[in-house]
């Protein structure tokens, strides 16, 4: 399978760097090829066009993240522990790869409707993890019965996503991972003074 070949991943990793540095619209396939250390034509053995590279990049990176997350949350007992893990892993992934953070938080957002639909399809695995955590939490009594799981999932993902976007927009000047517990507590306890 060509996706597992080393050159495929070289191109994916090079695309992350080039797109982060130049922006998606200013990133030519030739720049990606040069960064990857391959001939321009080699790119087309793996990808149809630049848009395909962007989608594949997101699918590859998010797919790996989702697979690891599905395994890691099995080791956690409660919904709160699982949610804490999702938040910290999400923040750690992007804090550890500044270029990937720029691509996922800024460049993917500037794409056309068709591209956004493909990205949303890839995100379904992540959202399913959140749905599972919420559903298990309701069943165990940890989360209140009658919770609108879909709305809660959107709010959780939106909070995580916006926290990362703000960090990227602020030139990554502070410790994103250090915000994990604060974000968790806000999501779990809300703003109500009990």
UniProtKB/Swiss-Prot annotation:
Gene giving rise to this polypeptide: fadR
DNA damage among keywords: no
Gene Ontology BP terms: fatty acid metabolic process; lipid catabolic process; regulation of DNA-templated transcription
Keywords assigned: Cytoplasm, DNA-binding, Fatty acid metabolism, Lipid degradation, Lipid metabolism, Repressor, Transcription, Transcription regulation
Main localisation: cytoplasm
Keyword Metal-binding carried by entry: no
Subunit structure, as described in the record: Homodimer. Binds to DNA.
Compartments reported by the entry: Cytoplasm
Protein name from the UniProt record: Fatty acid metabolism regulator protein
Residues annotated as domain HTH tetR-type: 5-65
Function: Transcriptional regulator in fatty acid degradation. Represses transcription of genes required for fatty acid transport and beta-oxidation, including acdA, fadA, fadB, fadE, fadF, fadG, fadH, fadM, fadN, lcfA and lcfB. Binding of FadR to DNA is specifically inhibited by long chain fatty acyl-CoA compounds of 14-20 carbon atoms in length.
Highest taxon, organism lineage: Bacteria
GO cellular component: cytoplasm
GO molecular function, one term: DNA-binding transcription factor activity
InterPro entries according to UniProt: Homeodomain-like_sf, HTH-type_Tx_Regulator, HTH_TetR, Tet_transcr_reg_TetR-rel_C_sf, Tscrpt_reg_YsiA_C
Residue spans binding DNA: 28-47
Coiled coil: none
């Amino acid at each position: 399978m060509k996706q597992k070949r080393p050159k495929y991943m070289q191109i994916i990793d090079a695309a992350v760097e080039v797109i982060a540095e130049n922006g998606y619209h200013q990133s030519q396939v030739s720049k990606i090829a040069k960064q990857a250390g391959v001939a321009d034509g080699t790119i087309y053995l793996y990808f149809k066009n630049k848009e395909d590279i962007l989608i594949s990049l997101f699918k590859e990176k998010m797919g790996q993240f989702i697979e690891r997350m599905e395994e890691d949350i099995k080791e956690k007992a409660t919904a709160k522990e699982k949610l804490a893990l999702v938040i910290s892993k999400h923040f750690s992934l992007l804090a550890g790869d500044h270029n990937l953070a720029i691509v996922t938080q800024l460049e993917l957002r500037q794409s056309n409707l068709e591209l956004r639909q493909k990205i949303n399809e890839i995100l379904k695995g992540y959202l399913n993890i959140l749905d599972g955590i919420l559903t298990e939490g309701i069943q165990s009594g940890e989360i209140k019965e009658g919770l609108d799981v879909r709305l809660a999932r959107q709010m959780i993902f939106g909070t995580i996503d916006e926290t990362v976007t703000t960090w990227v927009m602020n030139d990554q000047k502070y410790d994103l991972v250090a915000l994990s517990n604060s974000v968790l507590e806000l999501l779990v306890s809300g703003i109500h003074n009990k």
